[in-house]
Design a protein with these regions (language model features):
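Flexible coil segments in periplasmic/lumen-exposed cytochrome c-class electron-transfer proteins
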Residues: 25-33, 37, 41, 45-48, ...
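Bacterial N-terminal signal peptides that target proteins for export
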Residues: 1-10
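Hydrophobic/aromatic residues in well-formed alpha-helices
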Residues: 6, 80-81, 110, 185, ...
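Disulfide-stabilized extracellular ectodomain repeats and their linkers
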Residues: 48-51, 64, 91, 151, ...
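Gly/Gly-Pro-rich "capping" loops immediately C-terminal to redox-active cysteine motifs
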Residues: 33-40, 44, 56, 60-86, ...
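Repetitive helical segments and hydrophobic/amphipathic motifs
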Residues: 13-14
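C-terminal motif of bacterial Sec signal peptides marking the signal peptidase cleavage site
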Residues: 17-20
Length: 248
């Protein structure tokens, strides 16, 4: 074997050895290597995995409030969105997502979600020249006045007692009221549920938008109807029977 053939043989063996290191059977392709969940930074992926189940794949149409509603996004600032995602909303189905609160997301990932919601769905000028009721009320509303506010602004759709009408369902159902927070009720009164045909505070009575006091009062009325113990009540024990705590 002359020198040239020796060089070619060595080069060939080296190439085969390199291929064996990089192209061995079973070695995953670069794109197939799983990404550390903490490193996911794409808004679409994070929203789909953590938000779409309740808020809808396009930010609307889910059981929870529409995040694609530009009126809502003009009312709720980034601190409100971040706080809800970080700590959840007590006594509701909205869980805490931040790792510091027992969730699965880093603070950076929550920032990505908040920023993505704002960039994708907000319309900064949607409330230009309009003065809606504030997101949070500095004062508690009056339930007695709220009953009258309901009759004026809400009964045409939800019925005279709030138990449902031809256009909308019950908003006084005990199970429903037990699943939502006071703030959720207030927010829905202000921004409506446009994806469900429910108008915001301006559209219930043409030419007569709800005042901030109207919003606070009807919210207080709804809150007053929430049962202390939601669900079907159990019958009380007979007077001559005392509970023993034993299961039989």
């Amino acid at each position: 074997m002359n020198f040239r053939r020796l060089v070619l043989a060595i080069t060939g063996l080296a190439s085969l050895s390199l291929y064996g290191c990089t192209g061995a059977p079973g070695r995953p392709a670069p794109g197939a290597i799983p990404v550390d969940p903490d490193e996911v930074s794409d808004f679409t992926a994070l929203y789909a995995q953590n938000c779409a189940g309740c808020h809808g794949p396009d930010g609307k149409g889910g059981a929870a409030i529409s995040l694609s509603d530009s009126v809502y996004l003009s009312l709720a600032d980034d601190a409100i969105l971040r706080g809800a995602a970080t700590k959840g909303i007590p006594k509701t189905a909205m869980p805490a997502f931040a790792k510091s609160e027992g969730g699965m997301l880093t603070d950076k990932q929550i920032d990505v979600i908040v920023r993505g919601i704002r960039e994708r769905w907000s319309k900064p000028d949607v409330l230009r020249g309009v003065n809606p009721a504030p997101y949070r009320s500095p004062e508690t509303g009056n339930p007695s006045r709220g009953s009258g506010v309901y009759s004026t602004y809400c009964s045409s759709c939800h019925g005279p007692q709030g138990r449902g009408g031809q256009k909308a369902s019950s908003i006084v159902d005990g199970s429903y009221l037990a699943l939502v927070s006071d703030q959720y009720l207030r927010t829905i009164v202000i921004v409506g549920r446009p994806e469900l045909g429910a108008p915001d505070w301006r559209g219930n009575v043409p030419g007569k938008p709800m005042s901030p006091q109207d919003v606070s009062d009807v919210t207080a009325w709804l809150v007053s109807l929430r049962p202390k113990f939601p669900g079907q009540p159990y019958p009380p024990y007979p007077n001559d029977v005392k509970p023993t705590g034993e299961i039989r």
